[in-house]
Amino acid sequence: MNKILICGLNGSGKSTIGKELSNILKYEYRDAEDYYFDKNNDYSTPRSKDEVCQLLYNDMMNYHNFIFSSVKGNYGSNVESLFTCAIYIHVDKETRMKRIRKRSYLQFGDRMLEGGDLFEKEENFFNFVSNRDDDEVINWLNSLNIPIIQIDGTLPINQITKELYNKIIN
């Protein structure tokens, strides 16, 4: 039984790596956004943290092998106690910000540019993300009593998943 947390700051590649690794390992995969936002609603109506914690806990109990990606995995002691290992993805701030802006443009197009209806909202998000510090995640990870695998998120995805596969399986 493996319950793997993939964490790192926004734009580090958590979702990309999580999806790819889950395909290789044949594990169930979820991202934090899957819990915060109902597929039938937009991003304007997130679920409460309590709801998210309960939904995540239920899935972790229902799936023998499970990968979850989030900036941190701080979703209560019930959830934290189920993780068997954590993967921390580090990416420099400049690369992360480029990835985030590109992702935003791919998702929202010109709406996120100056003059667009989402410009202010996206700029606020970019500022929030830009001010986050790796220490926030690292300090939280160090409070866990599980193996932590650190990986460079700027490496090619196939190299990352091969390295992670070998560490998880062996």
Predicted regions and their residues:
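Hydrophobic anchor at the beta1->P-loop junction of P-loop NTPases
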Residues: 6
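Conserved substrate/cofactor phosphate-moiety recognition/catalytic segment
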Residues: 19, 23-62
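Conserved AAA+ ATPase "sensor/coupling" helix adjacent to the nucleotide-binding pocket
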Residues: 102-110
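Small-molecule kinase domains that catalyze NTP-dependent phosphoryl transfer to phosphate-bearing small molecules
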Residues: 109-163
